[in-house]
């Protein structure tokens, strides 16, 4: 090897990102600044620990490990076997499940694996309607789940936006689905897992609970667990669970566990992402600590506080409040669309997402509401007092938008709120070991 080749070799292993790819470095640094200086209220987002970041950014990204611990199709897997075993055992302990698969790359893929394990194309299943708070993978017509299967959607009552269990039972008995899916991405009330299981048993269906949004609350003991009731439970590992982006599948049924394992590999995926599985294991260990119970309780308290503050300022909250980490704000009475609200709040450095409300007449790209969540801001350290202030800041921006002749006319209000946001976020720094360049 020549000296030049040796230098290149050394640089490959030792040059940092800023040296190798300044464009990507600048984008990451810009995102770091955004996260530091904005209040994150997207319900599906959270902020992970340094330990999770280190695990996910580790040399485990180099290792291929098709198969399962001690049953791999590649050599050199003795250490990644340790990692996956730890992730599995911690997940089982955290949720009180007999079996766990930690290999799903994402929430969509974990649910696809359940379909692959339990259904044939054309089979019937039931899931919560998207406008009632369901998820794309629960039967939306634009998703694979809605294209490959016969979907019967259920929803909420118009008068109170709560799940209509009588109608759900009627639909189940009429259509006799092979699978019933519960859980959603924008439903703020408790689920009656026991009642759903009774309905499933009566018609001979499987019950799948997708607890992606509330898994952290279940782990923290502030939300009823579906694990004793469901045939299969799926969850993403980020959101309220505060881990890396990925999926997790749980069951207490050994036969179903074997089907799930085969559906994930070789049915749906090849090699698992061992660096992500390591980060999942770290997050599960964090969630097993007493501090996580306090965190989960604070997430719910803060969401309730935000909902009550907005209600006191004249905003309509779907279903009248929340029992978990999220709330839907119905903006119809304010004559402001979800799209305009999201953009205006974004200019004020409050991040949320436009969201359809039950029986929404607006297009999905416009919507009549916004979805707000408390997990990320709670992770930063914001407490009830700060969430009251955040509620008032949201009210200022949206009331100003309602009164303004155009979005530009609301600029002074948005900039004044942005200054308040900056003052607040400066008190709650992220990753102080990292320099903001």
Curated annotation (Swiss-Prot):
It catalyses: (6R)-5,10-methylene-5,6,7,8-tetrahydrofolate + glycine + H2O = (6S)-5,6,7,8-tetrahydrofolate + L-serine. GO terms for cellular component: cytosol. InterPro entries: PyrdxlP-dep_Trfase, PyrdxlP-dep_Trfase_major, PyrdxlP-dep_Trfase_small, Ser_HO-MeTrfase, Ser_HO-MeTrfase-like, Ser_HO-MeTrfase_PLP_BS, SHMT-like_dom. It is an enzyme of class 2 (transferase). One of its GO terms (biological process) is tetrahydrofolate interconversion. The keyword Cytoplasm applies. PANTHER family: SERINE HYDROXYMETHYLTRANSFERASE, SERINE HYDROXYMETHYLTRANSFERASE 1. Homodimer. This is Serine hydroxymethyltransferase. It comes from Bartonella quintana (strain Toulouse). The gene is glyA.
